[in-house]
């Protein structure tokens, strides 16, 4: 998941699905923003400084009470133009403006040749523009102890370890290699 870089407050990934993009410290996109959490997080960590900027425009802010909350909390930098926002976040103005114009063309064409994104909302072309400094964060763990249907912990040979029980996120769980948002509710419902 994505967290605000200074406070570690969770920043909803849904904004990327709604049309936000991520740019790195060079002012460039670097990933299909709606990829799986593990892939996007790894790409974000690999960027200079291990952070990126989540970029939205006023049209997105008007439609989202979540973005409005982020603005009120002071998480956002703001600019009346692409160049002003670039200056506010410390990235090259020309590069950032080119990135934004290229993204808007991707939205118009419904095609992202560079990163293969297939989810397009509206262009990010309504001033002012906002950016939140984000980084990868942890809010759920996967993997762990193997249990049976009685929640008894099993050793590496699959045998019950007498008197040892486990439940919730400490167990191997049902998620496999990646977790879908909301799936952890099953853990909470079953195990309390």
Residue ranges and their predicted role:
Residues 1-191:
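Residues forming the flavin
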């Amino acid at each position: 998941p994505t967290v605000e870089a200074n406070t570690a407050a969770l920043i909803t990934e849904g904004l990327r699905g709604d049309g936000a993009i991520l740019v790195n410290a060079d002012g460039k996109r670097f990933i299909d923003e709606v990829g799986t959490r593990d892939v996007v997080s790894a790409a974000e960590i690999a960027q200079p400084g291990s952070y990126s900027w989540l970029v939205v425009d006023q049209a997105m802010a008007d439609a989202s009470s979540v973005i409005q909350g982020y603005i009120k909390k002071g998480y956002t930098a703001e600019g009346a133009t692409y160049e002003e926002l670039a200056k506010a976040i410390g990235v090259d103005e020309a590069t950032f403006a080119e990135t934004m114009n290229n993204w808007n063309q991707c939205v118009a064409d419904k095609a992202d040749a560079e990163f293969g994104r297939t989810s397009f909302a509206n262009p990010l072309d309504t001033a002012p523009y906002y950016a939140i400094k984000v980084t990868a964060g942890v809010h759920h763990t996967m993997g762990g102890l193997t249990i049976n249907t009685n929640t008894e912990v099993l050793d590496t040979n699959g045998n019950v370890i007498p008197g040892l029980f486990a439940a919730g996120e400490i167990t191997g769980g049902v998620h496999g290699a990646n977790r879908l948002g909301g799936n952890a509710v099953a853990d909470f419902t079953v195990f309390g």
